[in-house]
């Protein structure tokens, strides 16, 4: 990938394409070369890191404002304090705020581990207003030069109160992705079960509406294939018809002439179907000659000469 880099010449800046160029500086390079030069007022020959007040923009808008970067974006940010020198920086944006995580970490020189070249602060962006807010996956590393005080009296004073910020999105762990996927599967299973329950309830409602005034629940249909009213519940309509002077007799005749009659009762007046409504079980008649005990007692000689009246009664 070719990166467009602005090169500062003697009279003007010329933008050049550098094929294969990637900007992945180390923390020591960011502090000891880029930030220290900007703070001291030295001009860089390569305009790679732009100056921007990132707190006036949301983090998802910053990648389009960076000079360079694919997954990491760098900015020089002037420090905006709430109450004069030494106050707490204002890190509030239009739709959220940046919240620090932990304490600052000292960055030491690789050549001299005893020398601290800067401090690093890690912040996470939250949507909403402090102290409440929704945590996002946008992370910022803020680099600043250390304050040596009187020990660095001989050093040139800084001309600008500037920090260097690195913006990137935190990679989601595989475990969290698996948890999200399982949660989505559970939601889909729950929605499908809810659709099935709603469909079954609608079918039950339609069936109960077609039977007249008798209603039943979906649990009744699940427990029994077909239900009938008990004698106590079925006796009520006959009593009411007798009170009306026999006006319900034609209705009863019409119901008996119907080919199929489905009567559904409530769960408190259910009973098993009557025996008279079930078809009779057809079984073959028993043949006494097939009894093994009686077959042993029977012989042709007995058939001709010794048949008793009892034998005649059994075999003939």
Curated annotation (Swiss-Prot):
InterPro entries cross-referenced by the UniProt entry: NAC-dom, NAC_dom_sf
Main location: nucleus
Domain NAC: 17-170
GO biological process terms held by the UniProt record: positive regulation of DNA-templated transcription; positive regulation of response to salt stress; positive regulation of response to water deprivation
Function: Transcription activator that binds sequence-specific DNA motifs. Involved in stress response. Plays a positive role in drought and salt stress tolerance through the modulation of abscisic acid-mediated signaling.
Localization: Nucleus
The protein's name in its UniProt record: NAC domain-containing protein 22
Gene: NAC022
Residue ranges: DNA binding: 117-176
Further comment: Plants overexpressing NAC022 exhibit enhanced tolerance to drought stress and salt stress.
Pfam family for this entry, one: NAM
Keywords assigned: DNA-binding, Nucleus, Stress response, Transcription, Transcription regulation
Lineage of the species this protein comes from: Eukaryota, Viridiplantae, Streptophyta, Embryophyta, Tracheophyta
Low complexity: compositionally biased ranges: 230-244
Induction remarks: Induced by drought stress, salt stress and abscisic acid (ABA).
Annotated segments matching region Disordered: 229-260
């Amino acid at each position: 990938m070719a990166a467009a880099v602005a090169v500062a010449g003697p009279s003007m800046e010329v933008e050049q394409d550098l094929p294969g160029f990637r900007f992945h500086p180390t923390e020591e390079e960011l502090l000891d070369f880029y930030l220290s030069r900007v703070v001291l007022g030295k001009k860089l020959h390569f305009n790679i890191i732009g100056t921007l007040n990132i707190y006036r923009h949301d983090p998802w808008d910053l990648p389009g404002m960076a000079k360079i970067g694919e997954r990491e974006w760098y900015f020089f940010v002037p420090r905006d304090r709430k109450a004069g020198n030494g106050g707490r920086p204002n890190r509030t944006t239009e739709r959220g705020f940046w919240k620090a995580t932990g304490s600052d970490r000292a960055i030491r020189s690789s050549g001299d581990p005893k020398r601290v070249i800067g401090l690093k602060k890690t912040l996470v962006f939250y949507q909403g207003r402090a102290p409440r807010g929704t945590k996002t996956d946008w992370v910022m590393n803020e680099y600043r030069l250390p304050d040596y005080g009187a020990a660095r009296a001989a050093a040139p004073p800084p001309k600008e109160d500037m920090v260097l910020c690195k913006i990137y999105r935190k990679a989601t762990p595989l475990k969290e992705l698996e948890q999200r996927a399982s949660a989505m599967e559970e939601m889909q299973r729950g929605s499908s079960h809810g659709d099935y329950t709603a469909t079954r309830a609608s079918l039950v409602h339609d069936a109960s509406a077609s039977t007249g005034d008798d209603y039943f629940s979906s649990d009744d249909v699940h427990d029994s294939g077909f239900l009938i009213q008990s004698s106590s519940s079925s006796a009520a309509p006959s009593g009411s018809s007798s009170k009306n002077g026999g006006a319900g007799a034609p209705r009863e005749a019409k119901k008996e002439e119907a080919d199929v009659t489905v009567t559904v009762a409530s769960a408190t007046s259910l009973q098993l179907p009557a025996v008279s409504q079930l078809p009779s079980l057809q079984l073959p008649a028993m043949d006494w000659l097939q009894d093994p005990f009686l077959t042993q007692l029977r012989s042709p000689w007995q058939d001709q000469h010794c048949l008793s009246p009892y034998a005649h009664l059994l075999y003939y």
